[in-house]
């Protein structure tokens, strides 16, 4: 990985899953921010840069899909650096949304290798600047 630690924001209201992802990414050398709600995620992004976002679709007060659009609208550099996590990837609503808003889709249950591979692809590509910084 590059010399500067890359920051990954994990947005999932399932605290046990969020903690597993946080620990795994920290072991790989990433700086990790965790949010259990859309509001917290937006506040964290407003407070400082993130290089990639792992975003659950089902959040308590706002859908992850709506948060995705809000993030890309405010921080266009994060477009292409947000992966949607869901167990409902085959639902019509999700398929239609993904067709209109291309982004990475990580189907739950996923394995950590899928997360690491996606992060390597979006963060280590030559010429990639920091996300919303």
Give names to the regions the model predicted.
Residues 34, 59-62:
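Residue-level signal for the "D+5" position in two-component response regulator receiver
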Residues 56:
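Active-site residues of response regulator receiver
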Residues 37, 63-67:
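Acidic catalytic/metal-coordinating carboxylates
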Residues 1-9, 15, 73-78, 111-133:
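Non-catalytic signal-transmission and effector/linker regions of two-component phosphorelay proteins
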Residues 85-86:
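Hydrophobic/aromatic residues positioned on beta-strands within the core alpha/beta folds
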Residues 34-52:
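Acidic, metal-coordinating helix/loop segments flanking the phosphotransfer/catalytic sites
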Residues 18, 60, 90:
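The feature encodes the CheY-like receiver
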